[in-house]
Amino acid sequence: NHASVGDLVVLIGGSTGRDGIGGSQFASDSLENEDRSAVQIPDPFIEKLIIEVVLEARNEKCINAMKDLGGGGLSCAVSEIAESLGIGIEMDVDHVHTKESGLFPDEIMTSESQERMLIITDKKKLQKLRKICDKFRIMCSTIGYVKSDKMLHVKKGTKTLALLPAEFIARAPLLDRKSSKPKYLNGIKREKKIRKIPNHSKTLLRLLSSPNIASKHWVFRQYDHEVGIRTVVKPGFDASVLRLDNGKFLSAKIDGNPKHCYIDPRQGAIGCFEEACRNVVCTGANPIGMVDHLQFGNPEDPEIFWTFMESLKGISEYAKFLRVPCVGGKVSFYNETASGPIKPTPLIGVLGIIDKTPFLPSATNSGDYIVIIGKTKDELGGSEYFEYIHKFIGGACPIVDFKDSKINMLSVLSLIKNKLVKSVHDCSKGGFAIALSELSIFGNIGCDVNIDKLPCEKNLSFEKLLFSESHSRYLLTVDKKNIELVKQFLSKKKISFNVLGKFSGDQIKIMYKSKYAIKCTIDIAQKKYFNTLGDMLKHG
């Protein structure tokens, strides 16, 4: 990034309109009535064209500095780029291309209309930049120029509307809010006594139809996720993988768990982060970066602000440990309804890189072994089992052991790299029983496992073995010719693992204390898993 006096300030992309005016304030304000002007209207096609414009303009050296227009629109983008480069900018709102006439200057400056980029270019490169924009039919307006006075000068024709130091606008003073630990946390970690479940097979099928667990294919199939013919691993399992132009592959996944974050905001946030990393690792990718979207209630409430701060501490702590940088993010406050605030909801997106051939799970065959990596603990707190089956949110939230987390990840990546596994799937929502069922559902083959072989803490109940959502666990599908090599490799790593059983037949069978405690056919499990969410959304 650099800029010289006399360089031109150019706005490219979508037209500026009333949509999105005050959008960031709207996202951080108490909702008392509907405000349509605050809702941005996206256009993915224009966004794609802008990406092409930026890439070509970069290659033609038409860009000295650049900033996307997000929260606050032009008012923030212009002041922030001026402050960061130590320059001044004079701009004219009359030169901004708009969707409609009659927009007031303050509306033009604060509109958050989507798909817009601010570019600083050399005068000599302006015509080249315009030609590139014309090629992709993207609008391009010269709205100002660079000065040396470090001031933001906003004009309408010859009339000065604002003249302020760019630093004053870009570096707003920080607000030191009060925080206090929520009172509800004092008793929520106590596990209430729950009724005995007579039929665990029915319980498993019920959980497979839970909206939080059931397949989301009804949603993502409504958008063509193969545009550009770059999708190598499609959405619906652990993470998606895209082919990049440089021959490498990009793995991407977003995860969140409000129930865990409600019980323990810090550990819940770490768990979301680790789950996203696990999913990326399951595709053979090494996590290289993350983004977050932090959604909370009213930060003026000390208890809500405490949950926000705890979540941030957890995310920061795990990011530093893994050395995975946070490359972007978004915060949305005041998410409340008449019934109260939402649960603390950090969403974590993780990107991973695969340098060579991507890991594509191969077909599961009868006789393939099922191996688990990771330890199951007394951590049913915030589980799908507790909420969906027993209508209870509480108990001991899963805690990430940083050492186990890293060594388990690296071990899985090594197994994939050495082509010793046919597929990898992480254990998360619903616990071991759901992860195992998903392997059978996607492989269209039954399984026969002995849950007594599960690496775990002592004296865990059958329900906790099945449905605890302990972190850092992976299920591996291993060909019989490789099983001894896998066992030798994992034994040397001194991590918790075991061979639980094999794939065979057309039933999901789980043995406990020498008896089959769960038996259900694959076709019924598939119907529950694939059809429930669509039926619910279509028919209520």
What kind of region is each of these model predictions?
Residues G22-Q25, K181-S423, S428-A433, S437-K458, ...:
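Non-catalytic terminal/interface segments that mediate subunit docking, oligomerization
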Residues N1-F136, G144-M151, K155, A170, ...:
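Mobile "lid/hinge" segments at catalytic clefts and subdomain interfaces of large enzymes
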Residues I12, G256, F308, L465-F467:
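Bulky hydrophobic/aromatic packing residues
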Residues G70-L208, Y318, L322, V327, ...:
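Glycine-/charge-enriched secondary-structure boundary and capping motifs
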Residues V5, P173, P235-G236:
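Short loop/turn elements that form and flank the Walker-type P-loop nucleotide-binding site
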